[in-house]
């Protein structure tokens, strides 16, 4: 049977001494004087801290690793640099520079002149404004401008389509009245 080397570790079998217990100094009684055991534990912790003042063993080898770690940390810093990929070859393929964009001219679909004329003649707003003018009422400048634009467009469309405005004179109306047979309406 092989021999076992004796250790001084504290195990479950051995009773725990008060001196071996780690006493949390912050948990120690607040406002009261520390006990002898607590003072001893505190002194031991202070001594351990004082004992390791110098550099760690093998510091000349670990210093190189720290520098490498610092370089990696600098590269990983998200605040520095951009993640956007930059092309190494400049390509200009029919792409205008910013600020030199040619505006696209929107082509307005022209409506059939006959339909446009019909829409203008059936425009309720225009008819109401014309009725107000015939009644002798005054209308605002914007309404008057709208009426003028619509009437000008109507006259342009009538010329384009070859339709003549039949302005009947009073003489023509009088002649038609004379020719009419009144007995027809009884």
Curated annotation (Swiss-Prot):
GO MF: GTPase activator activity
Biased composition (Basic and acidic residues): 62-77
Protein origin, superkingdom: Bacteria
Coiled-coil ranges (or none): none
Entry keyword set: GTPase activation, Ribosome biogenesis
Region Disordered, residue ranges: 39-77
BP-aspect Gene Ontology terms: ribosome biogenesis
UniProt similarity note: Belongs to the YihI family.
Function: A GTPase-activating protein (GAP) that modifies Der/EngA GTPase function. May play a role in ribosome biogenesis.
HAMAP family on file: GAP_YihI
Subunit structure: Interacts with Der.
Protein name, per record: Der GTPase-activating protein YihI
Taxonomic source organism: Haemophilus influenzae (strain PittEE)
Lineage per the UniProt record: Bacteria, Pseudomonadati, Pseudomonadota, Gammaproteobacteria, Pasteurellales
